[in-house]
């Protein structure tokens, strides 16, 4: 699915991505000399709010190993950004204990589906089971009334 590219917004994402990688200790520049790398990073930090300069910095200084990773990160961010606009495509998050996640993950693998699909399946099965149980209870009560009269 294609999503509209918003240059100013995406330049901000690229800047944040590069700064995060740098803070995590990764080499984000193509420069071998540390003084050149430090100067390039200082320049990057100065141009946070200059989208066209961020793009020029990427062309001039960014490590080639990061090129695909940056493209993938921006593509994913773009998808999340546009999906968040509509309720039915917006992702929700839940906290699970590890053992619960592990059981759910195993069940999803058995079913050959995603975790979301597995949760949906298990909920519908539980609902079906509950309705069947109520029906059996109702039949037992009716049978009991018939036998006692």
From Swiss-Prot:
<dbReference type="InterPro" id="IPR035087">
    <property type="entry name" value="MatP_N"/>
</dbReference>
<comment type="function">
    <text>Required for spatial organization of the terminus region of the chromosome (Ter macrodomain) during the cell cycle. Prevents early segregation of duplicated Ter macrodomains during cell division. Binds specifically to matS, which is a 13 bp signature motif repeated within the Ter macrodomain.</text>
</comment>
<dbReference type="InterPro" id="IPR013321">
    <property type="entry name" value="Arc_rbn_hlx_hlx"/>
</dbReference>
<dbReference type="GO" id="GO:0051301">
    <property type="term" value="P:cell division"/>
</dbReference>
<dbReference type="GO" id="GO:0006355">
    <property type="term" value="P:regulation of DNA-templated transcription"/>
</dbReference>
<comment type="subunit">
    <text>Homodimer.</text>
</comment>
<dbReference type="InterPro" id="IPR009390">
    <property type="entry name" value="MatP"/>
</dbReference>
<keyword id="KW-0132">Cell division</keyword>
<dbReference type="GO" id="GO:0005737">
    <property type="term" value="C:cytoplasm"/>
</dbReference>
<comment type="similarity">
    <text>Belongs to the MatP family.</text>
</comment>
<dbReference type="GO" id="GO:0043565">
    <property type="term" value="F:sequence-specific DNA binding"/>
</dbReference>
<dbReference type="Pfam" id="PF06303">
    <property type="entry name" value="MatP"/>
</dbReference>
<protein>
    <recommendedName>
        <fullName>Macrodomain Ter protein</fullName>
    </recommendedName>
</protein>
<keyword id="KW-0131">Cell cycle</keyword>
<keyword id="KW-0963">Cytoplasm</keyword>
<dbReference type="InterPro" id="IPR038339">
    <property type="entry name" value="MatP_N_sf"/>
</dbReference>
<dbReference type="InterPro" id="IPR035375">
    <property type="entry name" value="MatP_C"/>
</dbReference>
<keyword id="KW-0238">DNA-binding</keyword>
<dbReference type="Pfam" id="PF17414">
    <property type="entry name" value="MatP_C"/>
</dbReference>
């Amino acid at each position: 699915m294609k999503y509209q590219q918003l240059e100013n917004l995406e330049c901000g994402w690229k800047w944040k991505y590069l700064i995060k990688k740098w803070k995590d200790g990764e080499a984000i520049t193509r420069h071998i000399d540390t003084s050149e790398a430090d100067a390039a990073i200082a320049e990057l930090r100065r141009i946070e709010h200059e989208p066209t300069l961020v793009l020029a910095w990427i062309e001039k200084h960014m490590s080639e190993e990061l090129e695909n990773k940056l493209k993938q990160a921006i593509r994913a961010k773009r998808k999340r950004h546009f999906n968040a606009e509509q309720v039915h495509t917006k992702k929700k998050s839940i906290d699970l204990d590890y053992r619960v996640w592990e059981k759910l993950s195993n069940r999803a693998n058995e079913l050959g589906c995603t975790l979301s699909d597995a949760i949906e399946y298990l909920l519908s099965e539980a609902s079906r089971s509950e309705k069947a149980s109520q029906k059996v209870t109702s039949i037992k009560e009716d049978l009991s009334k018939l036998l006692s009269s």
